[in-house]
């Protein structure tokens, strides 16, 4: 059994009184002051998250060979990226399932970075190395060398720009910049996993510890709170964002996983592109959708989803009590013919069917500043 890993902020979390839990092979804070308080702080002001458990994999080499390689193993169009742009994408296996959902950072035609999930970055690295061309491309897992924190919320821009002493409006949504701060180069990316405006900040480990403590104190008067995985989960479900191991896995294609919007036709075929593009055109048997309960109850993972005749039509993949909406919400994989906005369904909670409706619209408006 492998040893549970700790992020560089582990002792800081303990000093703050965080409740720690295992997650993706890491010992991580699930909450500090409380999930609802942390959730509301992120929706109304700002939340600070330790995401140093995520992976950073660098792809470098000759421009055409690097691009062709990345286009082969992903379904979104890496070719469409400009320098200093970020893209949500999926690393595919040979059957069209997801090795991981990732963000790809383009520094230049010769250099990209893949940010991968904590439990998957070693698998992603091995998968990339398996299909590496004979020459012209280098894959380097540099995760142990990087520190990453996320500052999220409607006040994130105000707090971070004042903290740095510079404006950040020039960094557009899903773009990043290399900034010099106190003699250290940091990557500041306008991305996140909460449905709110904010930044994901990459740095060296020693400097990352300074950034966390500095931002924590600087943002406190504006309502900033340190936030754990509990709030991160309620926030992402409200934003209808998938989580690997729940809505995403190595069996379901991007279409079946509800992220079909990232599937593109490309100049050259990619892993299972024929199958995936056919699904995008013709549909699939099952698909991920969001739902909201219309009566009391809290849905969790792997609950049965029923139609109003009592027939099983799918299973929940994620569920929670929404602090923003004050009701149970979740995501589920259900039969495609049943997917219609406002369609009444039932979620079986403790063997009791609870009424719910399918929703195709966002649960919350959020504060993301789209370009």
From Swiss-Prot:
GO terms for cellular component: cytosol; glycine cleavage complex. It is an enzyme of class 2 (transferase). It comes from the Bacteria. This is Aminomethyltransferase. Coiled coil: none annotated. The glycine cleavage system catalyzes the degradation of glycine. PANTHER family: AMINOMETHYLTRANSFERASE (PTHR43757), AMINOMETHYLTRANSFERASE, MITOCHONDRIAL (PTHR43757:SF2). GO terms for molecular function: aminomethyltransferase activity; transaminase activity. Its EC number is 2.1.2.10. Keywords: Aminotransferase, Transferase. Belongs to the GcvT family. The gene is gcvT. The glycine cleavage system is composed of four proteins: P, T, L and H. Disulfide bonds: none annotated. It catalyses: N(6)-[(R)-S(8)-aminomethyldihydrolipoyl]-L-lysyl-[protein] + (6S)-5,6,7,8-tetrahydrofolate = N(6)-[(R)-dihydrolipoyl]-L-lysyl-[protein] + (6R)-5,10-methylene-5,6,7,8-tetrahydrofolate + NH4(+). It comes from Leptospira borgpetersenii serovar Hardjo-bovis (strain L550). One of its GO terms (biological process) is glycine decarboxylation via glycine cleavage system.
